[in-house]
Amino acid sequence: IKEILIGRGLVYKYVENPSEVAAKYLVRNYVVGWFQGRMEAGSRALGNRSILMSPLKAENKNILNHKIKFREHFRPFAPAVIIEKMHDYFVNPREEGFMTCSFDVVQEKRESIPAVVHVDGTARPQMVSREANPRFYDLIRGFGELTGEYVVLNTSFNVKGEPIVQHP
């Protein structure tokens, strides 16, 4: 990654703990391009090639759909939650690491994480364990320690009609 950045004349800064730095940017409501680890294939971002944003503001869904993803306004975004907290957010959840099932969002949390709750009160979450993806887990945990909500908005690192990015 460093060679590509230098080759393109881009300014960069190496950080010791990217999870901590990214969590702090999310708290400030920045959009974070999260690129780490192995490539991902398929239509779901699972924490290696992701666009991340805070789920705490409803308008973040519109910002991503219109200004970054260039897609329809009604398209929902998925929450990524650390597995230990899944029962705090979802009714009868299972350990779903691949965003394949929808669950009802606990009523008390619907207003706390509006950017990732579908119009019918459900969400299609990714439950993230430290064993499966340590850096992504640490990012979500760090966001939770700063905000009280152990969830981030996670969408694929691409724009409408394009594949997920594979390299920097």
What are these regions (language model features)?
Residues 1-168:
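Flexible beta->alpha loop and helix N-cap segments adjacent to enzyme active/binding sites
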